[in-house]
Amino acid sequence: METKLPPASTPTSPSSPGLSPVPPPDKVDGFSRRSLRRARPRRSHSSSQFRYQSNQQELTPLPLLKDVPASELHELLSRKLAQCGVMFDFLDCVADLKGKEVKRAALNELVECVGSTRGVLIEPVYPDIIRMISVNIFRTLPPSENPEFDPEEDEPNLEPSWPHLQLVYEFFLRFLESPDFQPSVAKRYVDQKFVLMLLELFDSEDPREREYLKTILHRVYGKFLGLRAYIRKQCNHIFLRFIYEFEHFNGVAELLEILGSIINGFALPLKTEHKQFLVRVLIPLHSVKSLSVFHAQLAYCVVQFLEKDATLTEHVIRGLLKYWPKTCTQKEVMFLGEMEEILDVIEPSQFVKIQEPLFKQVARCVSSPHFQVAERALYFWNNEYILSLIEDNCHTVLPAVFGTLYQVSKEHWNQTIVSLIYNVLKTFMEMNGKLFDELTASYKLEKQQEQQKAQERQELWQGLEELRLRRLQGTQGAKEAPLQRLTPQVAASGGQS
């Protein structure tokens, strides 16, 4: 007997064990709801609980697919797909253990069948497959317990139904990668709405789910040519909302990893749409607080663009200089690392356009009191290709950094930084000794002039202070003079009386 599939949006029954009925929206105090949500145990946020039906029919094992004749295979396959569309409550570890095991065994069998059996993916089973996948994976993600959630430090909220969900994702992936997969048939069901819901799942806190979603979306992008532009557009929307509205989306790193592969396959010359994506989305992504979570993937995307079109280099570097962090040393180190990756692929003709503003920023980093920032900036001179670019343009780069290098070599508190600066100055001296000597003399003369001006300023202030004191004494003397004239008169009048 076939098991009836529950609808994907079926709400939890108020009579379900362990769950309280949800009051109408107009009867709920928003503040009390928030405080109650924080007080609940972590496990209460499973998204599967909202679709579980306590009165569902008990599952019974079906015959194995390998044991039935070929004429009955597809009918049994449809029945197993229907079984796998039944949802269970994983918050209660001991509830429906038999049904959970029946579904798990059926999912395992489906994964093995679609991955190894040829001729099983015929057109009539496609709607059943997509329905089963949709019922299991598409759900409203639970709100984060911690509004200040830090992916690097806090433990993620794992999906309790993962024992089943993992097998559904594995089945979906095998389905897309099967030699019998027909995109022309599947596109009736894997449409824009399906893709949009798939993208929304990237906000899941569970990294295991996001890893599967990353691979699956990449396969969908490769199989369905008509959905490619739509996928890129929706990714743009997600990033823009992340930058300018919410600053919270768990799957940014995974989406950027997919886009890095997509960018690598862009045809030349690049379309205007793709260039705008770089300038309006990827560069502003450097401004968000959680940059460290996805910076490696973001930097890869940027470098891929520059390898495709070198003329974008100036826009990228000026954009990075615009968003350069002022107070976060960790982000500053990341920016310096990305800048070195860019300089590794930059063309000499493009380097000339950005060398002055770039190395002025590098000089500011060298003068940073945070030794990691200064150290990372000085490592530029350990890169042979960057060193060759500097040598070819020494007349511009050296004046931009010399003053800072010379001053920091005398004043920095960290001896490691001082040693690195001495090595850099020695390298510059070997590159162009004449220019180095001229800049040294100019720097010393400038410092002497500054000291002279400082001394003149001090003398001026000292003179003004002396003048103030003289005027103050003069004012006091003027006030005392009438009193001195008045004293004899008072004495004389006293004597007459």
Swiss-Prot record:
Record's GO cellular component terms: cytoplasm; cytosol; nucleus; protein phosphatase type 2A complex
Induction profile: By retinoic acid; in neuroblastoma cell lines.
UniProtKB keywords: Cytoplasm, Phosphoprotein, Ubl conjugation
Superkingdom: Eukaryota
Molecular function, one GO term: protein phosphatase regulator activity
PTM notes: Ubiquitinated by E3 CUL3-KLHL15 complex; this modification leads to proteasomal degradation.
Keyword NADP: no
Main location: cytoplasm
Biased composition regions of type Low complexity, renumbered to the chain: 1-19
Region (Disordered) residue spans: 1-55, 475-497
Tissue specificity annotation: Highest expression in brain.
Quaternary assembly: Component of the serine/threonine-protein phosphatase 2A complex (PP2A). This complex consists of a common heterodimeric core enzyme, composed of a 36 kDa catalytic subunit (subunit C) and a 65 kDa constant scaffold subunit (PR65 or subunit A), that associates with a variety of regulatory subunits. Proteins that associate with the core dimer include three families of regulatory subunits B (the R2/B/PR55/B55, R3/B''/PR72/PR130/PR59 and R5/B'/B56 families), the 48 kDa variable regulatory subunit, viral proteins, and cell signaling molecules. Interacts with SGO1. Interacts with AKT1.
Similarity section: Belongs to the phosphatase 2A regulatory subunit B56 family.
Record's protein name: Serine/threonine-protein phosphatase 2A 56 kDa regulatory subunit beta isoform
Annotated source species: Homo sapiens (Human)
Lineage: Eukaryota, Metazoa, Chordata, Craniata, Vertebrata
